Amino acid sequence: MYQSLMTVRETQIAIKEVKTFFEDQLAKRLELFRVSAPLFVTKKSGLNDHLNGVERPIEFDMLHSGEELEIVHSLAKWKRFALHEYGYEAGEGLYTNMNAIRRDEELDATHSIYVDQWDWEKIVQKEWRTVDYLQKTVLTIYGIFKDLEDHLFEKYPFLGKYLPEEIVFVTSQELEDKYPELTPKDREHAIAKEHGAVFIIGIGDALRSGEKHDGRAADYDDWKLNGDILFWHPVLQSSFELSSMGIRVDSKSLDEQLTKTGEDFKREYDFHKGILEDVLPLTIGGGIGQSRMCMYFLRKAHIGEVQSSVWPDDLREACKKENIHLF
């Protein structure tokens, strides 16, 4: 039966260790400046992240003006707008401590309706919009993960070390070709188990089979220049997503992707106009789950062991039977 390697109190102390180390290194190595982040945005701005395009944001109106507002799902689009508003230049970027509510999240060991992540975004030049630049950025982030594991091992040697020396890059099409009989999720399990750490490139568009590896909203990632960082989780014995990131859409790719998803109405939103008219800067960015990080590096079996959220009674009871104690 599962046994946590730390008490609740020890876990809380270690969570701070994980977050502080990673935040400092992320800012330093990607040359990012921390900024304040909104909890909600106006609906008409189009700045909310609609994730896979079907999740419902929490909506409410403001008494003063009656304007409709939405709790953010993430800050994928807001960050790009902020870079423009704050006058950042190519090579410069920002990051935020993002908190969000995703009401339609399917709850399980790795998913909660409460989301906390380091949301970051950086301005790039046109010639940087390549797979090579994407991979270079992934390698930088993976280097932080490796150093974090080493740092924790010095303080908590019982946590062990599991990350391989290098992260492997593979496209979603290569995965389908390699494992045609498996579902996309099972392909992730297979490749993560084989290598320990992988980055899957190209998520959102249809593969040769006609199926998508996974859904992605049409208006933030360029589907050819994005991907997910996956590790093999030693406790769960499954693939485990730490980050979704990518080079963002330019006017050409946004135009194509909105047409593919039948979302031409979004062309009238301020944010989308800013991209289509080449007003907003070209960027790369992503979200790195804070609770996901803590869950992986502290070898936890459930995300509720590293964050406070709301869980149905039957789920809490099932966890208790497995010796999993949720915050």
From Swiss-Prot:
Keywords: Amino-acid biosynthesis, Asparagine biosynthesis, ATP-binding, Cytoplasm, Ligase, Nucleotide-binding. GO terms for cellular component: cytosol. One of its GO terms (molecular function) is catalytic activity, acting on a protein. Pathway: Amino-acid biosynthesis; L-asparagine biosynthesis; L-asparagine from L-aspartate (ammonia route): step 1/1. One of its GO terms (biological process) is L-asparagine biosynthetic process. Pfam families: AsnA (PF03590). It comes from the Bacteria. PROSITE patterns: AA_TRNA_LIGASE_II. It catalyses: L-aspartate + NH4(+) + ATP = L-asparagine + AMP + diphosphate + H(+). It is an enzyme of class 6 (ligase). It is found in: Cytoplasm. HAMAP family: AsnA. Belongs to the class-II aminoacyl-tRNA synthetase family. AsnA subfamily. NCBIfam families: asnA. This is Aspartate--ammonia ligase. It comes from Bacillus anthracis. The gene is asnA.
